[in-house]
């Protein structure tokens, strides 16, 4: 099986060699950062349509974590185009963080379409180093389709715990590796290197639930599901929330 995976990966490498050459020359990262927001703004429309019920379920109790003022302070890490905004409760104070500055113009459009929120600021930073956000300063942190592409899951989860107030919550929805015995997992392994390059560092075979289980949360509510998505490769999902 490993030999078959190697041969198929080699074939895909040959087919996508121009991308690897651009990456070797240091050009692909710049191109990817430019085009990825345009891809994501279209992908998230489809994703939100197919995952709307799960997102509404996930975010249904957000307001329960509001601070004494009654207003919810929310930090979204890897905010992308602002696809989650419509699921947040009215009056929610939202800060966004993303390492790609090219998302900002799409965020501005999303903010204009979601007047029920109080937008605070957009910070260009990686989730592994959110030094611009003070310790214990937010009620809720949200990550959706982010843990698949971060460079260090343990570090970003430590940062999440740092910025959350005691009793605050971390909400997540992530595609993950399929069960090892399935054909889906086989094709995830075959396509993972090319997928990682093409989709801005995204990984198909991450077992993100393990990092969440190891993190220093006092409570973890996590579910595994087969998401109702068109792309079978990303149907295996986890979603839920963890309390600091």
Curated annotation (Swiss-Prot):
GO terms for cellular component: cytosol; endoplasmic reticulum; extracellular region; lipid droplet; membrane; tertiary granule lumen. Residues 1-28 are annotated as: Targeting to lipid droplets. The keyword Membrane applies. Keywords: Cytoplasm, Endoplasmic reticulum, Host-virus interaction, Lipid droplet, Membrane, Methylation, Methyltransferase, Microsome, Signal, Transferase. Pfam families: Methyltransf_11 (PF08241). GO terms for molecular function: methyltransferase activity; mRNA m(6)A methyltransferase activity; RNA methyltransferase activity; thiol S-methyltransferase activity. Thiol S-methyltransferase that catalyzes the transfer of a methyl group from S-adenosyl-L-methionine to alkyl and phenolic thiol-containing acceptor substrates. Together with TMT1B accounts for most of S-thiol methylation activity in the endoplasmic reticulum of hepatocytes. Able to methylate the N6 position of adenosine residues in long non-coding RNAs (lncRNAs). May facilitate lncRNAs transfer into exosomes at the tumor-stroma interface. Promotes osteogenic and odontogenic differentiation by regulating the expression of genes involved in stem cell differentiation and survival. (Microbial infection) May be involved in the assembly and release stages of hepatitis C virus (HCV) life cycle and thus play a crucial role in HCV propagation. (Microbial infection) Interacts with HCV non-structural protein 4B/NS4B (via C-terminal region); this interaction may promote the recruitment of NS4B in the proximity of lipid droplet. This is Thiol S-methyltransferase TMT1A. The gene is TMT1A.
């Amino acid at each position: 099986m490993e030999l078959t995976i190697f041969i198929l990966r080699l074939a895909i490498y040959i087919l996508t060699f121009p991308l690897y050459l651009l990456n070797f020359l240091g050009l692909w990262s710049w191109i990817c950062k430019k085009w990825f927001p345009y891809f994501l703004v279209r992908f998230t429309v489809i994703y939100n349509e197919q995952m709307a019920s799960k997102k509404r379920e996930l975010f249904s109790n957000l307001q329960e974590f509001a601070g004494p003022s009654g207003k919810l302070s929310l930090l979204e890490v890897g905010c992308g185009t602002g696809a989650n905004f419509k699921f947040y409760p009215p009056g929610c104070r939202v800060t966004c963080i993303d390492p790609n500055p090219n998302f900002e113009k799409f965020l501005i459009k999303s903010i204009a379409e979601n007047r029920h929120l109080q937008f605070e600021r957009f910070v260009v930073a990686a989730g592994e180093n959110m030094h611009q956000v003070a310790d214990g300063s937010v009620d809720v942190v949200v990550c959706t389709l982010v843990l698949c592409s971060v460079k260090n899951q343990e570090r970003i989860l430590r940062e999440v715990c740092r910025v959350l107030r005691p009793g605050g919550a971390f909400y997540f929805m992530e595609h993950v590796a399929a069960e090892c015995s399935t054909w889906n997992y086989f094709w995830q392994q075959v396509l993972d290197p090319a997928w990682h390059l093409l989709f801005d560092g995204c990984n198909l075979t991450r077992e993100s639930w393990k990092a969440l289980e190891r993190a220093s949360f006092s409570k973890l509510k996590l579910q595994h599901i087969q998401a109702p998505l068109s792309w079978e490769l990303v149907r295996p999902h986890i979603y839920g929330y963890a309390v600091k």
